[in-house]
Amino acid sequence: MRARFFIAFVAFLLLATSCASRKKTVAPAPPQSFEWLTANMAIQAEGNGMVYNDLSGQLRMRKDSLVWLNVTATMGVEVLRVKVSNDSVWIVNRIEKTYLAEPLDTISAQLGMPLSLPLVQTLLLDNNQGLPPVENQTVQLKTFVMGELSAKIRYNNIRLNEKTTFPLKITDKMERIRLLKKQ
């Protein structure tokens, strides 16, 4: 009797679930809007024939206002500080004891392409919406202070607001985007 009841129950479950309509997958979440963003990063960089694996960084960003990046080595020694505002860029290189304070217009002219704070934020957030179209151009990233540097950045924790914290692993596509001076 038990065996018949079990077989009937399994048959009923199969019939009840097999004929159901297929549910649609959930649509991707819309892009998050934020006022302030804080992200911790693990950075692997190559430059001057060396590989730097033990770099970490903190990115702070206020939408349409400010980008602040601190890069530290082991034991919390600050290596690089970058601040980008609406009209200027400040870069402090603690290793070579140099700094750069220039208007965005000057750096844009040196790169030979338009550069603005919304563009920098778009590149850092890997948000392709709003990027100016690049026509048949190869672009290479070269820093003014650190020399040639290729970096892979992993964001560990991103806080969009104080209430929203979630761990993410975002591969930063900036390594593929390279800015070149026009020659």
Residue ranges and their predicted role:
Residues 61-62, 84, 134:
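Generic beta-strand structural signal
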Residues 1-7:
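Bacterial N-terminal signal peptides that target proteins for export
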Residues 131-183:
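Non-transmembrane domains of secretory- and envelope-associated proteins
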Residues 20-23:
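Bacterial signal peptide processing site
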Residues 67-117:
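An acidic-aromatic
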Residues 15-18:
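C-terminal motif of bacterial Sec signal peptides marking the signal peptidase cleavage site
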Residues 27-48, 170-176:
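Transition segment at domain starts
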Residues 36-77:
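Post-signal-peptide N-terminal segment of Sec-exported extracytoplasmic proteins
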